[in-house]
Amino acid sequence: MNKVVLLCRPGFEKECAAEITDKAGKREIFGFARVKENAGYVIYECYQPEDGEKLISELPFSSLIFARQWFVVGELLQHLPPEDRITPIVGMLQGVVEKGGELRVEVADTNESKELMKFCRKFTVPLRAALRDAGVLTNYETPKRPVVHVFFIAPGCCYTGYSFAHNNSPFYMGIPRLKFPSDAPSRSTLKLEEALHVFIPEDEWDERLANGMYAVDLGACPGGWTYQLVKRNMWVYSVDNGPMAQSLMDTGQVTWLREDGFRYRPNRNNISWMVCDMVEKPAKVTALMAQWLVNGWCRETIFNLKLPMKKRYEEVSHNLAYLQAQLDEHGVNAQIQARQLYHDREEVTVHVRRLWAAVGGSRDER
């Protein structure tokens, strides 16, 4: 199987294609990307027949910015008979996947696919039963086995394949299903909530998002991101010239600092988190984030980079390379991840976790 399907935000197919071509090439897995504008997915076709599986095994999914999900597939199944779509799909998967741990019948995230998604939901139950009978799926769901994907691009037309549970998105279609809290000051709160789900393993939440931590929110008004930190019982310094929502101030956990986020300097030495969603040029935001991390002013940060209209992948790559270079130059070991989240628009979200430094900061992990 030499094709890899990558799901992405509609309108960002070129960025997704540029990224997978670049990162696959660096691992000497060569091929070309098939791109259809606003399709919500890209197909990377490897030149060597077994390189599809090699790519989804060797390249960490967490290193991809513009892909929401990926899986290796075979040839396109077309003209599935309406009276029996199941038999051809089972036939395609037999001998390819054995004892898969989960089935996902998916579509691209486009308006055109909404009707198709209704069919996928109904189709999943009988297909799952047939795949279990054929030995393609285990009799129970397990995260220890590959995930079987059936990806419909049109009625009666699908790709079939699989991904590895340890190197994919755990979410259906790569999208966490989050509900907007009615008491949140703005919808931007969902960006930070999704980022926490994507970047921080669930079993580490109690330690890394603990009660009583101190956090800073730069460019906080009206408080969408502060809301998430308050909900996790943190003490938050919200920095913005604009006012904060009164509901947040009433919690007693928020200190509003009427300052410019770029000029603010923390006066505590025990800040665990700094978050930032300011509308500013990516280079300026990245330089500020580097300053915070190099100086050890926080242990972890999540921030957004607003994207230009053109050369978006190149712009993000350039800024992440600058950030890495600054950390390296100052002897800071950190883990950097970036992703265009479902709730992001013309932007990407970056997470950096400072692990240790040659010159000790106050929030280093030893």
UniProtKB/Swiss-Prot annotation:
Question: Sorted alphabetically, which InterPro entries does this protein's record hold?
Answer: RlmM_FDX, RlmM_THUMP-like, RNA_MeTrfase_FtsJ_dom, rRNA_MeTrfase_M, SAM-dependent_MTases_sf
Which biological processes are named by the entry's GO terms?
methylation; rRNA processing
Record localization: Cytoplasm
This entry carries the following GO cellular component terms, namely: cytoplasm
Q: Which reaction does it catalyse?
A: cytidine(2498) in 23S rRNA + S-adenosyl-L-methionine = 2'-O-methylcytidine(2498) in 23S rRNA + S-adenosyl-L-homocysteine + H(+)
Residue positions binding S-adenosyl-L-methionine: S188, C221, P222, G223, G224, D240, D260, D277
Catalytic class of the enzyme: transferase
Keyword annotations for this protein, in alphabetical order, are: Cytoplasm, Methyltransferase, rRNA processing, S-adenosyl-L-methionine, Transferase
EC number in record: 2.1.1.186
Which residues of this protein are catalytic? K306
Family under the similarity heading: Belongs to the class I-like SAM-binding methyltransferase superfamily. RNA methyltransferase RlmE family. RlmM subfamily.
Q: What is annotated about its quaternary structure and interactions?
A: Monomer.
* Record HAMAP family: 23SrRNA_methyltr_M
Protein name (database record): Ribosomal RNA large subunit methyltransferase M
Q: What is the lineage of its organism?
A: Bacteria, Pseudomonadati, Pseudomonadota, Gammaproteobacteria, Enterobacterales
